Amino acid sequence: MAYRKLGRTSAHRKAMLRNLTTDLIVNEKIVTTETRAKEVRKFVEKMITLGKKGDLASRRRAAAFVMNVVADVKEENDDVVVQSALQKLFDDLAPRFAERNGGYTRILKMSERRGDAAKMVVLELVD
């Protein structure tokens, strides 16, 4: 499978893609460059597909890639419920995209970045 090097070493590239994938799962929208967005989209599509499968092997594969960060904090009665990015993927996003066969993300173009004129885009999850 071909991939973009993005001007980084393999470890740096993998860390950046993991971070962007996790950020998109948590926030459901990120602003980044066009080439990064096109590369991150591949990983997000795979993670949501794993979430739709929902078995133990899929959970372990997703847990190995998605960062362990807090996605949401809710207060119910006197309890504080903390939801991780992985829980959000399997509990919220997977049921939302259950009827959709791929194409979970959308790329919207923005104006160029002021400093270096890089093409900027908004990468978001489709409703």
Curated annotation (Swiss-Prot):
Superkingdom of the organism of origin: Bacteria
Any GO CC annotation of this UniProt entry: cytosolic large ribosomal subunit
PROSITE patterns assigned: RIBOSOMAL_L17
GO molecular function, one term: structural constituent of ribosome
A Pfam entry, by short name: Ribosomal_L17
InterPro entries tied to this protein: Ribosomal_bL17, Ribosomal_bL17_CS, Ribosomal_bL17_sf
Keywords (A to Z) from UniProt: Ribonucleoprotein, Ribosomal protein
Keyword Ribonucleoprotein on entry: yes
Annotated GO biological process: translation
UniProt keyword Ribonucleoprotein present: yes
The family this protein is said to belong to: Belongs to the bacterial ribosomal protein bL17 family.
Assembly description: Part of the 50S ribosomal subunit. Contacts protein L32.
NCBIfam families assigned to the protein according to its UniProt record, in alphabetical order: L17
Name the UniProt record assigns to this protein: Large ribosomal subunit protein bL17
Organism: Ligilactobacillus salivarius (strain UCC118)
